[in-house]
Amino acid sequence: MSALGVSVALLVWVAVLLLVSIWRQVHSSWNLPPGPFPLPIIGNLFQLELKNIPKSFTRLAQRFGPVFTLYVGSRRVVVVHGYKAVREVLLDHKDEFSGRGDIPAFHAHRDRGIIFNNGPTWKDIRRFSLTTLRNYGMGKQGNESRIQREAHFLLEALRKTQGQPFDPTFLIGCAPCNVIADILFRKHFDYNDEKFLRLMYLFNENFQLLSTPWLQLYNNFPSLLHYLPGSHRKVMKNVAEIKEYVSERVKEHLQSLDPNCPRDLTDCLLVEMEKEKHSAERLYTMDGITVTVADLFFAGTETTSTTLRYGLLILMKYPEIEEKLHEEIDRVIGPSRIPAIKDRQEMPYMDAVVHEIQRFITLVPSNLPHEATRDTIFRGYIIPKGTVIVPTLDSVLYDNQEFPDPEKFKPEHFLDESGKFKYSDYFKPFSAGKRVCAGEGLARMELFLLLSAILQHFNLKPLVDPKDIDISPVNIGFGCIPPRFKLCVIPRS
């Protein structure tokens, strides 16, 4: 080896030692949770399986314990695994860990709205939005009638399939999308409306793309990948198109606004903006309102739609469960009356199935990232302000002590020995604490009423033998994505 080669090798070696020394000093000075040693630039990327990051978290938790530290690039991440640790983060330290971790794919919504907002306005905007949603019937009788009305449209659309195979992705999605559209815009779309179908396509495509390995990479190395071609560009383009549509609706609402008679949530937000017109510090702006409404539109459509669709696939896999549901529906509701939320008390098996669907699919397995709002002592460790916190929901929903055989779909997980519904505090698909899903009450009502209505009127018929149906997700990242499938719905006599 030449003298120059030896010199370069020594310089590289010294640089590596220096980086290791700096990392150890920083790590020890903060008394962070344990974790694997990070490499320069990429951090612990090689410890993560990009096609199934939750699986990687489980493996690392077995090695380092329920609270451990990772570095993804230069970003410090503390992963919290298991019921006790997750509960402590979300509830016992709800203020300290209430920030929103950065999601670069949604930078168009950063520091605005209620989902991706990590700015000073999110608490006030979220509080007002939740209050307004409750006033418009979120989780109460007002939304029950909304969902029941939409169930009629859904059932009619299903009848029009005439027992022929169809892909349920968008037909099923029309119902929850129309429910949230009514709350936001006081608008009902026809199931064949091209703009309506386009919006649902954008919602669905983004949810799928966010769960791909490329988006996992992009969200952790945005500065390196931003200018490269890739699906992150498609996500951002879709976000911009959705935002443009919502912006047009908000402008239309402003032009016809009557402050004394708000028609929907968008009007209520605009009324607050008008009140602040002469204020030096404004909480509500046109752009902020647009992002808030877009957040609710996306979340209120895609999560419930995907859960319902995944639920239908699971029920076709287990026809004996579907048959038990038919029997309970016939006994409690009968063939004619539309299902009501009061029926849930008399339908423990349906209630258990709805809960088990949500537990089993673990729609957002690693939660949305939180962030430490200040230096915090947690379980004897010091978590610095700005640290990304990942409370893994799948580790709670798949706890094998609370849910024996968690990898199996078993409604009995939510039934006691007498067949009555049994609630579990481990049931946290909507997260908990300051960042709990704003639409939890609405989603729970939609899932029960819409699934009950479908099974009241139809038998589900798969195109293959139930034993051959694969209910494994095709991607596990931001969400758990079900496989595409077709089915037939056969009217019950």
UniProtKB/Swiss-Prot annotation:
The protein's enzyme class: oxidoreductase
Catalytic activity entry: an organic molecule + reduced [NADPH--hemoprotein reductase] + O2 = an alcohol + oxidized [NADPH--hemoprotein reductase] + H2O + H(+); (5Z,8Z,11Z)-eicosatrienoate + reduced [NADPH--hemoprotein reductase] + O2 = 19-hydroxy-(5Z,8Z,11Z)-eicosatrienoate + oxidized [NADPH--hemoprotein reductase] + H2O + H(+); (5Z,8Z,11Z,14Z,17Z)-eicosapentaenoate + reduced [NADPH--hemoprotein reductase] + O2 = 19-hydroxy-(5Z,8Z,11Z,14Z,17Z)-eicosapentaenoate + oxidized [NADPH--hemoprotein reductase] + H2O + H(+); (4Z,7Z,10Z,13Z,16Z,19Z)-docosahexaenoate + reduced [NADPH--hemoprotein reductase] + O2 = 21-hydroxy-(4Z,7Z,10Z,13Z,16Z,19Z)-docosahexaenoate + oxidized [NADPH--hemoprotein reductase] + H2O + H(+)
SUPFAM superfamilies the UniProt entry points to: Cytochrome P450
GO MF assignments: arachidonate epoxygenase activity; heme binding; Hsp70 protein binding; Hsp90 protein binding; iron ion binding; oxidoreductase activity, acting on paired donors, with incorporation or reduction of molecular oxygen, reduced flavin or flavoprotein as one donor, and incorporation of one atom of oxygen
Binding-site residues for heme, renumbered to this chain: 437
Keyword rRNA-binding: no
Binding site residues for substrate: 298-303
The protein's Enzyme Commission number: 1.14.14.1, 1.14.13.n7
Regulation: The omega-1 hydroxylase activity is stimulated by cytochrome b5.
Cell compartment(s), UniProt: Endoplasmic reticulum membrane; Microsome membrane; Mitochondrion inner membrane
Cofactor(s), names only, from the UniProt record: heme
GO biological process: epoxygenase P450 pathway; xenobiotic metabolic process
Membrane topology: Peripheral membrane protein
Pathway where this protein functions: Lipid metabolism; fatty acid metabolism
One GO cellular component term: intracellular membrane-bounded organelle
Keywords: Endoplasmic reticulum, Fatty acid metabolism, Heme, Iron, Lipid metabolism, Membrane, Metal-binding, Microsome, Mitochondrion, Mitochondrion inner membrane, Monooxygenase, NADP, Oxidoreductase
Expression triggers: By ethanol.
Function: A cytochrome P450 monooxygenase involved in the metabolism of fatty acids. Mechanistically, uses molecular oxygen inserting one oxygen atom into a substrate, and reducing the second into a water molecule, with two electrons provided by NADPH via cytochrome P450 reductase (NADPH--hemoprotein reductase). Catalyzes the hydroxylation of carbon-hydrogen bonds. Hydroxylates fatty acids specifically at the omega-1 position displaying the highest catalytic activity for saturated fatty acids. May be involved in the oxidative metabolism of xenobiotics.
Recorded family membership: Belongs to the cytochrome P450 family.
Oligomer and partners: Interacts with chaperones HSP70 and HSP90; this interaction is required for initial targeting to mitochondria.
Protein name: Cytochrome P450 2E1
Native organism: Macaca mulatta (Rhesus macaque)
